[in-house]
Amino acid sequence: MFRIVNGEDYSPAVQQRNILDFGKAPSLLWTDNGSSNDRCDTGGNGRESGQDRVKRPMNAFIVWSRDQRRKVALENPQMQNSEISKRLGYDWKMLTEAEKQPFFEEAQRLRAMHRDKYPGYKYRPRRKPKRPQKLLPADSSVLCSRMHIEETLYPFTYKDGCAKATRSRMESQLSNSQPTNISSSLLPQEHPSSWTILRHNRVTQATQTCGRPLLL
């Protein structure tokens, strides 16, 4: 059931009433007739119709594959649509130029008709929405930044602490798995810190100068 909307319905009062009654009234859809400015009420669910979007003119392959796709689908009902497309693409490549020529001519005729019907048409492909990048949890980012700062400010302390923690963890694992005595030479050795190296150098210099070590 269609209702023609005349020019008086474009008054501000009528437009305001249409906005208020938008949730109750059926959705409004422009007709596809380019020579008419009327609108018609439909029983749609308010979603945008595909009739507003102008389709591209068919190329030679699409013209050829229309009947071929239907034929392959009837002969192979279990075949997926993606497999049918691959098969049609292979069959199209196997055709000779003479066999393809009628479909190129038909595509050219359809393109001319499309150009006359839609003179200002421009192909605008639909862009896929960008997927949001995965972000690290707040705790992980804070922990990573804190470890980076500590390693930058205290390089020797940070490395010594990591070495001690690794050594203690390996000792506990080895003691639980193998109760026998294991030589300490097999375990990773601790690297001396900067303070230990500095202290050893001072003791060595004092011994060479005075003949006996100085107590620090």
UniProtKB/Swiss-Prot annotation:
The keyword Ligase does not apply. GO terms for molecular function: calmodulin binding; DNA-binding transcription activator activity, RNA polymerase II-specific; RNA polymerase II cis-regulatory region sequence-specific DNA binding. It holds the Pfam family HMG_box. Residues 31-52 are annotated as: Disordered. GO terms for biological process: cell differentiation; male sex determination; sex differentiation. It is found in: Nucleus speckle; Cytoplasm; Nucleus. Keywords: Activator, Calmodulin-binding, Cytoplasm, Differentiation, DNA-binding, Nucleus, Repressor, Sexual differentiation, Transcription, Transcription regulation. Residues 54-122 bind DNA. InterPro entries: HMG_box_dom, HMG_box_dom_sf, SRY, SRY-related_HMG-box_TF-like. Its main location: nucleus. One of its GO terms (cellular component) is cytoplasm. Interacts with CALM, EP300, HDAC3, KPNB1, ZNF208 isoform KRAB-O, PARP1, SLC9A3R2 and WT1. The interaction with EP300 modulates its DNA-binding activity. The interaction with KPNB1 is sensitive to dissociation by Ran in the GTP-bound form. Interaction with PARP1 impaired its DNA-binding activity. Transcriptional regulator that controls a genetic switch in male development. It is necessary and sufficient for initiating male sex determination by directing the development of supporting cell precursors (pre-Sertoli cells) as Sertoli rather than granulosa cells. Involved in different aspects of gene regulation including promoter activation or repression. Binds to the DNA consensus sequence 5'-[AT]AACAA[AT]-3'. SRY HMG box recognizes DNA by partial intercalation in the minor groove and promotes DNA bending. Also involved in pre-mRNA splicing. Belongs to the SRY family. This is Sex-determining region Y protein. It comes from Kogia sima.
